[in-house]
C-alpha cells in the first residue's frame, strides 16, 4: 500500500464500492440514498459473484413480509438463533447490529428498490427457530442480483466493469484515500475516495491467506466465486 494524499487525484468520488454483487449493490444504494456521490468498480465484465451461485435466501427478523405471512418474529429472535448456531464464537456486537437491521433492510429492498422478495413461511432453516428466510420467486441469487443492478442503474449510480482493483492508497494519517485499478488493456487508473467499501468477498479463494488465518482449514476445498482478495491483505 502506497501513500497518496486525497488532493492529488484527478478523479475522486465520495463513496467507492469495490464489488458489484448483492453486498456491493446494496451498499451503493444505501450510500446514494444518504446523499453521497457513489461509484462501483467490478472486476468482471458482467457482475455475478457468489450471489449468482447462491440460492439467494436472506434471513431477517421482524420484516413486514413476515408479519403479512403471520410469522411472529423479531430481531432479538434472529440474534439469538445466530449466536447459538455459531456456538457463541461470533462477534456479539456485529450479530446484534446485523439482526437489528435485518427486517428494515428487507422492507427497504422490496419497497424502495423493487427487489422481488417474499417470506419462505413453510421452511425453517437449520439452526433457526422460526422462518427467518426471504427469497426471490426463482430461489436463485442471480434473480436478486439482476434486480439490484437494475436499481443501481435506475438511481444513476456509476458502475464500471472490467475494473480490477490492484492496490489501495492511504494518506499520511493512514486513512484510505483511493485505489489503483487495472483495465483489460493493462492500463492502470487511480481513483480517489472519501470512503472505501470492500464488497469483494472474503479470502476463501486465497489458499495463502486461509493457511495463515485459518490453518485448520488450509486443506479445505473452496467452491465459491474465485477471488484472491489482495485488497484485504493490502489493507
What are these regions (language model features)?
Residues 20, 62, 183, 200-201:
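Glycine-rich, N-terminal phosphate-binding loop of Rossmann-like dinucleotide-binding domains
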Residues 24-27, 206-207:
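Short glycine/serine/threonine-rich phosphate/pyrophosphate-binding segments
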Residues 27-28, 106, 233:
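Generic hydrophobic/aromatic pocket-lining and core-packing "Φ" positions
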Residues 7-23, 39:
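Beta1/beta-strand and adjacent pyrophosphate-binding region of the FAD-binding site
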Residues 184-187, 191-235:
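Glycine-rich loop(s) and the adjacent beta-strand/alpha-helix scaffold that form part
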Residues 2-7, 36-37, 43-158, 164, ...:
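Conserved N-terminal/central alpha/beta ligand/cofactor-binding core
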Residues 31:
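Aromatic pocket-lining residues of Rossmann-like dinucleotide-binding sites
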Residues 136-194, 233-235:
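Helical element adjacent to the flavin cofactor pocket in flavoenzyme catalytic cores
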Amino acid at each position: 500500500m502506497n501513500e497518496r494524499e486525497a488532493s492529488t487525484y484527478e478523479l475522486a468520488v465520495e463513496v467507492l464500492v469495490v464489488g458489484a454483487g448483492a453486498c456491493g449493490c446494496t451498499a451503493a444504494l444505501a450510500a446514494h440514498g444518504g446523499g453521497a456521490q457513489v461509484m462501483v468498480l467490478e472486476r468482471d465484465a458482467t457482475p455475478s459473484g457468489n450471489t449468482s451461485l447462491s440460492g439467494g435466501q436472506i434471513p431477517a427478523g421482524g420484516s413486514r413480509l413476515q408479519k403479512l405471512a403471520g410469522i411472529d418474529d423479531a430481531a432479538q429472535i434472529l440474534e439469538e438463533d445466530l449466536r447459538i448456531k455459531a456456538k457463541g464464537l461470533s462477534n456479539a456486537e456485529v450479530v446484534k447490529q446485523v439482526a437489528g437491521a435485518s427486517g428494515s433492510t428487507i422492507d427497504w429492498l422490496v419497497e424502495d428498490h423493487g427487489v422481488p422478495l417474499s417470506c419462505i413461511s413453510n421452511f425453517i432453516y437449520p439452526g433457526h427457530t422460526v422462518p427467518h428466510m426471504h427469497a426471490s420467486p426463482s430461489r436463485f441469487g442471480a434473480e436478486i442480483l439482476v434486480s439490484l443492478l437494475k436499481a443501481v442503474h435506475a438511481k444513476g449510480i456509476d458502475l464500471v466493469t472490467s475494473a480490477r482493483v490492484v492496490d489501495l492508497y492511504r494518506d499520511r494519517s493512514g486513512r484510505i484515500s483511493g485505489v489503483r485499478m487495472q483495465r483489460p488493456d493493462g492500463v492502470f487508473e487511480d481513483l480517489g475516495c472519501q470512503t472505501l467499501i470492500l464488497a469483494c468477498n472474503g479470502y476463501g479463494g486465497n489458499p495463502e491467506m486461509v493457511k495463515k488465518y485459518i490453518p485448520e482449514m488450509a486443506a479445505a476445498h473452496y467452491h465459491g466465486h474465485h477471488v484472491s482478495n489482495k485488497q484485504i491483505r493490502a489493507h
